[in-house]
Amino acid sequence: MKYLGTSKMSLKEINEEFYKLACYFNVFPGSDRTYVMLEGLKENMPKAMALFEEILADAQVNKEAYGNLAGDILKKRTDAKLNQGQNFNKLIQYAIWGPKSPATNVLTTAELQQMDPQELVDRIHKINSFDHKILYYGPEKPQAVLDIIKQYHNVPEQLQPVPAAIEFSQQETPENRVLLAQYDAKQIYYSAVSNRGEKFDPAIQPTLNMYNEYFGGGMNAIVFQEMRESRGLAYSAGAFLITPSKLKYPYVYRTFIATQNDKMIDAMKAFDEIINNMPESEKAFNLAKDALITRLRTERITKSDVLWSYLNAQDLGLNTDSRKELFEKAQTMTLPEIKAFQEKWVKGRTYIYCVLGDEKDLDLKGLSQYGPIQKLTQEELFGY
């Protein structure tokens, strides 16, 4: 969309006009939410919105721009396969979702190259015809904002429902198994992923946050102290019970280690030991409590982030700021409460063990003790 002109204005003229108005727009396509954003000076909002709406309604195909865009995407894909972090992220996504996931739901090279850009432009023209929300952050009075929207935001009398998205399911982990992906490096990236299918429960959130702070958080947390400082088995390490982003998704427990290839099995054994038999330290707990309370005291959600925090809360069925309850309960929380939480929510889990490393340098016999090994190609991980 940012590459297109209209029947009346070239792309250069559009960019010049937005520059004069000290405004700009952006487009954010997502797997379950797409939004367009207009930002700039209050006094120029009507003109900027009129221009923006003109682009939505009258964007014209630019085949040369599409060819360049497709080429850029293919170049980024090639670069991504060379990056250790990108490979590891795709491996984690495979463990969470399985072979069919939002991460692999991408156009093939042939589809990218052969696509008619008119299809994309037609979708731009239709975006205002679907159900949507309008969010506003700024100094203008509410009624003035409504008046501007009514005047410049072009919508049909009857909006259409948003087309159903492709549904992907996060896979549970009923038994231990290993996913191994080849990457030529002297250091492995390792993660254990566990999903028992437990859905969002606001009642556990304060204790969950304190557990994460105490056990898997920063440099004073148990994981970092045990795995790096005490045992020297990892360059970096962490472990967290991750809160779902939507009600339909489950909690996922996930660990992370970066270590030398020859230390892989020792690191995995040590990690399993502290996860299932969590060390208890009042000193470390008090540091974690102080860190969490201090962060809550100083953290501010401001400007347009207030709107997004509100939408994120709605996605979990909440109508209040969950940090308030967390702050109140954190004051009196105790280490035995964290231990009880760990016994119920963490201990004894089964995992998908993910290893990204150079296979020729790894102890595959030792790795097989953690479950059957499935070797994955980059095509399986990236979807192309």
Q: What role is predicted for each listed range?
A:
Residues 8-9, 60, 64, 201-205, ...:
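Ordered, soluble secondary-structure elements with a strong preference for glycine-centered loop motifs
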Residues 175-176, 187-189, 205, 220, ...:
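Active-site lining segments that contact anionic ligands and/or coordinate catalytic metals
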Residues 13-162, 236-384:
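Charge-rich, well-structured scaffold segments of protease-associated domains
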Residues 161-222, 256, 383-384:
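His/Glu-based metal-binding/catalytic segments typifying zinc-dependent metallopeptidases
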Residues 1-7:
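Active-site SXXK
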